Each structure stands twice: as C-alpha cells, then as structure tokens.
C-alpha cells in the first residue's frame, strides 16, 4: 500500500495544476514546502489513517459516474468517523485525517476534479 500511496501523491503533484496533500488535505505548494512535507512524512504519520479510511470507504460510498458536489472531503471524513462504531466496531479509534481520506478514495479509484484554485 505504501507504494500505491506514493504513486497517488506523485500523480497529484504532476497534474496540470500541481496539487499537494498532507494530513490536513489539499494544501498550496508554498504551505507544503513551508511545512517540509514529503511522501515519507505522509506515510509515517498517515498510514494508519489511510488504512482505516480504505477499509470503510467501500462500505459507505457507492461509486457512480457522477461527481459529488454535495459533500466536501472534510464532511465525508466526519461521516466516516461517525459511522465506524456501527460498521467496523473493532476499530478502537475511529479518527482519520482529511488527507488520509482523500488518498484512500484515490486508491479505491474514485475520481477527482482538478480544483481551479487551492
């Protein structure tokens, strides 16, 4: 899974308008550089959250061929954490970060639209 995460992070940075991500979600290139974020740091701090998000996403979100304009990734993150106790009761700490949710959704093949501005 680590290699898949690195590949997704690299793909985001190579987009027409480069996109950078950390545990908080999408960030500007300046913020990414200022915080000295990198793929290894993301994996070291977010792997547990990505795995939890990866497990619950297919149980909560059906894939469609339409984009979701009603929910932000932040709202979806909260929806996941609120539903962990009912859906995956063995998970002790239901917290996942926004960045982990985004990466896990990409790993599942959910598509995203290039933001006009971050």
Model features per residue range: what roles?
Residues 24-26, 74, 110:
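Intrinsically disordered, low-complexity regions
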Residues 1-55:
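Intrinsically disordered, low-complexity serine/threonine- and proline-rich regulatory segments
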Residues 1, 5, 67-72, 97:
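A diffuse structural propensity rather than consistent per-protein peaks
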Residues 22-24, 35, 65-68, 83, ...:
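Detector for Asparagine
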Residues 40-87:
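Positively charged, polyanion-binding regions of nucleic-acid-associated proteins
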Residues 20-22, 72, 106:
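Generic detector of intrinsically disordered, low-complexity, polar/charged segments
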Residues 83-115:
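Charge-enriched amphipathic alpha-helical scaffolds
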